[in-house]
Amino acid sequence: MLEQMGIAAKQASYKLAQLSSREKNRVLEKIADELEAQSEIILNANAQDVADARANGLSEAMLDRLALTPARLKGIADDVRQVCNLADPVGQVIDGGVLDSGLRLERRRVPLGVIGVIYEARPNVTVDVASLCLKTGNAVILRGGKETCRTNAATVAVIQDALKSCGLPAGAVQAIDNPDRALVSEMLRMDKYIDMLIPRGGAGLHKLCREQSTIPVITGGIGVCHIYVDESVEIAEALKVIVNAKTQRPSTCNTVETLLVNKNIADSFLPALSKQMAESGVTLHADAAALAQLQAGPAKVVAVKAEEYDDEFLSLDLNVKIVSDLDDAIAHIREHGTQHSDAILTCDMRNAQRFVNEVDSSAVYVNASTRFTDGGQFGLGAEVAVSTQKLHARGPMGLEALTTYKWIGIGDYTIRA
């Protein structure tokens, strides 16, 4: 089955690569229209997925992530229309010039070819990824979570209808709808057809992909994010940032999970933190140095376990650790961070500069929330993932990250001397 999908995707990628920006936008507009026109089919499929998930004991938070409503589906369709408004990077000349030989050389952006994406049970990801791949002239093979298999199948069928109505092959967007996990291992070895693989899931999936994939893998999305509270910080302003970074959307990968507090400000900062976290419903996981003082406050407090410094809670839980100084904070981030997003809150710009230079994460912030690590917030439009590695993309992956480049030389029957 996957072999045939790979063949179809590779053939479709050749046709997609030849489309103009106007033609690609016409396809995206048709997809958005069809998502709305066939919304009942998608919503009915989603209702079955949610019912099964509820019967299997999934939490209310997870059920909310799975569920589609008419308003959410319209929002997804509108997001596709927003992709139409983004600048198309394909065909852009990055640099070039005329060589001494007379050869005119340029470096031009081109599609990658076929993208494979393995992702969690979020129905919006199916459309988001498909629209970004089509905008950049790439075919895509999707493998979504089993909890949304009906929703994904219905959504991809709608997308394929739109593709065919525009004269394009259905193989441009395909989904593996069989939940058998053995197919993931098979997909990881499809280097004959898939040019880049993006896993969006937990640490186990990322480890599996790194160890078994014969395809170049872009890993990321696991966010053990830190905020270091420096001794020179303005406490009231710092608390606003921390509340935003922890509570705005706790289930996202750019949410802060560990707060590192300079020991010289702990006595004045911790009581204020406890009050604010109590109001926000956050449970604090405190180290020995912070535990007694936080237990005297109104927030719920438990003793931190050593392994929790490596946890991505994705919930209203926050580690709190007292550190000696900036060096201690940086050392902790180097040991426990995932190179996603880390921040310093300080009035000392020398410390800020050191933090920026020495913390090796894809996004580093000074006096700002980690929640900004997002394609839309960065002005990239939608994102296909957040990469925490260094090749070939880093941070939020917008349209440019779904392209590569080729060298084009134009001569006048020019030969090398």
From Swiss-Prot:
Question: Which GO terms fall under biological process for this protein?
Answer: L-proline biosynthetic process
Q: What is the recorded function of this protein according to its Swiss-Prot or TrEMBL entry?
A: Catalyzes the NADPH-dependent reduction of L-glutamate 5-phosphate into L-glutamate 5-semialdehyde and phosphate. The product spontaneously undergoes cyclization to form 1-pyrroline-5-carboxylate.
| Claim: Oxidoreductase is one of the keywords in the record | yes
Q: In which pathway does it act?
A: Amino-acid biosynthesis; L-proline biosynthesis; L-glutamate 5-semialdehyde from L-glutamate: step 2/2
Question: Main localization of the protein?
Answer: cytoplasm
The text of the family note is: Belongs to the gamma-glutamyl phosphate reductase family.
**HAMAP family attached to this UniProt entry:** ProA
> Is Secreted a UniProt keyword of this protein?
no
| Known EC number | 1.2.1.41
Q: Where in the cell is it found?
A: Cytoplasm
The protein in question is named: Gamma-glutamyl phosphate reductase
The UniProt entry, under PROSITE patterns, shows: PROA
Which Gene Ontology cellular-component terms appear in the entry? cytoplasm
Query: Catalyzes what?
Result: L-glutamate 5-semialdehyde + phosphate + NADP(+) = L-glutamyl 5-phosphate + NADPH + H(+)
